[in-house]
Swiss-Prot record:
This is Peptide deformylase. The active site is at residue 156. One of its GO terms (biological process) is co-translational protein modification. The gene is def. CDD domains: Pep_deformylase. The lineage of its organism: Bacteria, Bacillati, Mycoplasmatota, Mycoplasmoidales, Mycoplasmoidaceae. It comes from the Bacteria.
Length: 193
């Protein structure tokens, strides 16, 4: 069964459930998780393919399962970073290493599950190493990522912990930055997941 993406799938940050950590996915994958996977892919790929307006959806480059009502540990990302297509659907991801140095997207971050705009620098690790079961490769993989892809992986991983990007903005000085922090300036037409 294929799904036509709709914004009615989205769960917003005013829903208490999305602010709680998600549960691990059990293997073998059941029908409910397969449905979740198909919906996540349909939603983000519609954005990637430039069809967000056609489907009347909020465009995004990534989405976590709890953003569409599945309280499980998986997310999907599909974006271009430095003119390279990046695509992964990670199940039960774990961050196994990260830099001490920080980074932020110069333009800030957005989120499919956040209606209110939150201005400021979202401070994250400059690079991360994450592992998880990749749906497309059908095996556990390890990814070391920087740049937009690295920021997006951290953004989606935060969702699985019940955390939102705006919780990483300095509440006293939203534009605070240190000179050694890396500024990431992607050319991007859509928001984060």
């Amino acid at each position: 069964m294929t799904f036509q993406p709709t914004k009615t799938w989205l769960v917003f940050d005013d829903n208490a459930l999305i602010n709680k950590p998600t549960e691990a996915v059990n293997f073998p994958i059941d029908e409910q998780i397969e449905t979740c996977i198909k919906k996540m892919i349909a939603y983000v790929d519609a954005s990637y393919d430039g069809k967000a307006q056609e489907y009347d959806i909020i465009p995004g480059i990534g989405i976590a399962a709890n953003q569409i009502g599945y309280w499980k540990q998986l997310f999907y990302i599909h974006l271009n970073d430095l003119n390279k297509e990046k695509k992964c659907l990670l199940i039960n991801p774990k961050i196994i290493d990260q830099s001490e140095n920080k980074a932020f997207l110069e333009s800030g971050e957005g989120c499919l599950s956040v209606k209110k705009q939150h201005k400021g620098y979202v401070i994250r690790s400059e690079w991360i190493t994450i592992k998880g079961y990749d749906w497309f490769e059908k095996k556990e993989i390890t990814i070391k990522a920087t740049g937009l892809f690295g920021m997006c992986l951290q953004h989606e991983f935060d969702h699985l912990q019940g955390r939102f990007f705006y919780q990483r903005i300095n509440p006293l000085n939203p534009w605070f930055k240190k000179p050694e922090w890396k500024v990431i300036n992607p050319t991007l037409k859509t928001s984060n997941g």
